[in-house]
Amino acid sequence: MKIHIMIAEDERLAREELMYLLQQENDIILCPSAENGDQLLNLYQEYNPNVIFLDIHMPGINGIEVAKKIRNEFEDKDIIIIFTTAYESYGVQAFEIQATDYLLKPFSEERFKIAMNRIRKTLSTKKVRKPKVDKLVVNLDEKMMVIDPNQIGFAAREGRTVKIHFISNEVIETKMNLKELEEKLSGFPFYRPHRSYLVNMDCIKEITPWFNGAYNLVIKDLAESTIPVSRTAAKGLFDALQGVHH
């Protein structure tokens, strides 16, 4: 499993040092970094990372308030938050927000490794607790529908709803958001190539270069389905496809 990690740090040198440490780990995919709290909130919603290394003292909204927003307003209880700060005084608040770790700057490579081990242990525990299901229950406007995830080609966010496209060309619409659907399908080979799409990797027919490092992909049996793959998501998709087909 690749771990998608985002850094929020306003000091360039500290940000680059942390990026360097993360790049030495072979199971990490680095999302774009944020330099302040508002930028982090925007990037978080777009890239949906597993882990955030979060500086506390940043311009504008500070790291503690950002974490509270993610936990409460976005109702993301699973995101792993690692606070990085030069101050010991925020330990109690970090505990209340259920941070996985609290790194005091400057921290050593050995201390960083301890944090990474905690991240992996937390993720593996969540993975064990999440059973794979054979069927998926989707709430439609007036009924509940039981579907076979293997028959889903892709799902696309359209406004406040998500349209699920089956390889039979049937389409259903649900008010479940794309992140919820992704979590329900965690035991199946689905990948988020773009903030507005979720695709079944077993149903990908072809992937073609587009521009600026981005790609387009086509789902087999759904000829009209050209789905964008963002530049930042492309490497993760190729890594995931290798894992599925080997």
From Swiss-Prot:
Instruction: Give the Response regulatory domain ranges.
Output: 4-120
What sequence ranges are listed for the domain HTH LytTR-type? 136-243
Keyword Cytoplasm in record: yes
Answer whether the UniProt record assigns the keyword DNA-binding to this protein: yes
Principal localization reads cytoplasm
Give the sites modified to 4-aspartylphosphate: 55
Keywords assigned = Cytoplasm, DNA-binding, Phosphoprotein, Transcription, Transcription regulation, Two-component regulatory system
Per its UniProt record, what PANTHER family does this chain match? STAGE 0 SPORULATION PROTEIN A HOMOLOG, TRANSCRIPTIONAL REGULATOR-RELATED
The name this protein carries in UniProt is Sensory transduction protein LytT
Say which species the protein is native to: Oceanobacillus iheyensis (strain DSM 14371 / CIP 107618 / JCM 11309 / KCTC 3954 / HTE831)
Give the gene name.
lytT
